[in-house]
Amino acid sequence: MAKNYYDITLALAGICQSARLVQQLAHDGQCDNVALRTSLSSILQTDPPNTLAVFGDHERVLKPGLETLLNVLNANRQGPGAELTRYCLSLMLLERKLFGHPQALRTLSERIGELDRQLAHFDLESDTIVSALAAIYVDVISPLGPRIQVTGSPAVLQNALVQARVRAALLAGIRAGILWQQVGGSRLQLMFSRNRLFQMAQNLLTHS
């Protein structure tokens, strides 16, 4: 069956956008707020009509993720690119662990559904919602292991709010990983279809 590289590339960009947010937060304590909102919002999209709808109404909302995907596909084994690649591969691995634990998947769905009550009173990017998303990551995803080692500024990473945002961004990466599998993504494509993914990401960036 022919693969839909448009959908696969969008989902990969979602994973990469989360990785970039984690990197920005860990080193600087702040990040691209528009990209963060896009990623956090994707967690709540449990019944989207299509792949793009998970993230928004236009490919431009994934511009940071598409740029990061190009970086990852061209990554050296050292430096910031290697760090982004490690985060992306770690998220993919954790998503596979989650898929193998039906109870964890059910719990994840239930916990996300419970956010509706809080979202009636708090903004998506509020400390309350971000902390709730972080708690879901800690309670449901972290126990599946192996834990993702986040590297950055030790002083920055001691900040509780930064920690919560990092975990919320990681949860968004898991959500994108689930989507990636659903649309036919696989790690083999990162080796054998790299050029097709790169070309698609470039095309999407050009039109975003």
UniProtKB/Swiss-Prot annotation:
Top-level lineage group: Bacteria
The keyword Cell inner membrane is assigned to this record: yes
Membrane topology value:
Peripheral membrane protein
Instruction: Give yes or no: UniProt keyword Translocase.
Output: no
Name the InterPro entries for this protein: HflD, HflD-like_sf
What is any one of the record's Gene Ontology cellular component terms? cytoplasm
Q: Which Gene3D superfamilies match?
A: HflD-like
Keyword annotations:
Cell inner membrane, Cell membrane, Cytoplasm, Membrane
Primary localization? cytoplasm
Q: Where in the cell is it found?
A: Cytoplasm; Cell inner membrane
Known NCBIfam families for this protein?
PRK00218.1-2, PRK00218.1-4, PRK00218.1-5
Please state which protein family the record places this protein in.
Belongs to the HflD family.
Protein name, entry field? High frequency lysogenization protein HflD homolog
Species for this entry: Edwardsiella ictaluri (strain 93-146)
Gene of this entry: hflD
